[in-house]
């Protein structure tokens, strides 16, 4: 863990170990894995399929618990927290973007972005204002009343990004967010993500196979034999 000595990483994975059982075989996916994410930094996680990219994202996002090690969010150790406390951290400090946008089809773009804030109990007027601002920032101000089926693939993914940052998280975790998009649309979605990193100083970790996009990020890391390796 480097960066500034006085700066606390938004997410720090310390000596993470995760194993799975396949038949009678015990597979080690992550082994004493360490990774720090810093405010305003974009990090590409590039590694072959089956290497543990999704597992690492799930653990960093408190969706899955490691067999050993500690996940720190904003300097707070999470292993001793209750399920309720972990859920609260996910809602306030972590945003998720997936390859499949998972928007609610019966909701408009605006309502989809409002939802995470409503779950937190924020007032409707406040959630409407913030959702409109984020959608406008991502160039979707004329799509707020459209439902997902009325939007293009790139527009749907930008709505998903807006939803992910609606609660102003510390960290944004994205699993192949441009994987289902054509190159031009993927570039637009990636640019939207990078704009948000610069504007909000959120930390962003993206698992991707797109090396062209990875090369445009602040850092590139890979997984080798369960360990995080920094790439040049």
From Swiss-Prot:
Chief location: membrane
Pfam families reported for this sequence: ABC_tran
Domain called ABC transporter: residue spans: 11-231
Keywords: ATP-binding, Cell inner membrane, Cell membrane, Membrane, Nucleotide-binding, Translocase, Transport
PROSITE patterns from the UniProt entry: ABC_TRANSPORTER_1 (PS00211), ABC_TRANSPORTER_2 (PS50893), LOLD (PS51244)
Enzyme class: translocase
Membrane topology category: Peripheral membrane protein
Keyword ATP-binding annotated: yes
Stored SUPFAM superfamilies: P-loop containing nucleoside triphosphate hydrolases
Keyword Cell inner membrane: yes
GO terms (BP aspect): lipoprotein localization to outer membrane; protein localization to outer membrane
Known partners and oligomeric status: The complex is composed of two ATP-binding proteins (LolD) and two transmembrane proteins (LolC and LolE).
Job of this protein: Part of the ABC transporter complex LolCDE involved in the translocation of mature outer membrane-directed lipoproteins, from the inner membrane to the periplasmic chaperone, LolA. Responsible for the formation of the LolA-lipoprotein complex in an ATP-dependent manner.
Assigned protein family: Belongs to the ABC transporter superfamily. Lipoprotein translocase (TC 3.A.1.125) family.
Official protein name in the record: Lipoprotein-releasing system ATP-binding protein LolD
């Amino acid at each position: 863990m480097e960066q500034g000595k006085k700066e606390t990483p938004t997410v720090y994975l310390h000596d993470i170990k995760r194993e799975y059982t396949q038949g009678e075989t015990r597979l080690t996916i992550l082994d004493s894995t360490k990774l720090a994410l810093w405010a305003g930094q974009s990090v590409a996680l590039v590694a072959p399929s089956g290497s543990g990219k999704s597992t690492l994202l799930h653990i960093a996002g408190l969706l899955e618990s490691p067999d050993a090690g500690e996940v720190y969010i904003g300097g707070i150790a999470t292993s001793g927290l209750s399920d309720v406390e972990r859920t609260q951290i996910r809602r306030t400090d972590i945003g998720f973007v997936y390859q499949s946008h998972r928007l609610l089809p019966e909701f408009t773009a605006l309502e989809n972005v409002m939802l995470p804030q409503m779950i937190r109990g924020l007032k409707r007027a406040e959630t409407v204002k913030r959702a409109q601002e984020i959608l406008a920032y991502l160039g979707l101000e004329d799509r707020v009343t459209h439902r997902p089926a009325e939007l293009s693939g790139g527009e749907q993914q930008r709505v998903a990004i807006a939803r992910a940052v609606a609660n102003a998280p510390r960290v944004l975790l994205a699993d192949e967010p441009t994987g289902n998009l054509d190159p031009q649309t993927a570039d637009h979605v990636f640019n939207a993500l990078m704009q948000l990193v610069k504007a909000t100083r959120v930390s962003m970790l993206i698992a991707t196979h797109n090396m062209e996009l990875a090369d445009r990020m602040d850092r590139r890391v890979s997984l080798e034999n369960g360990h995080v390796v920094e790439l040049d």
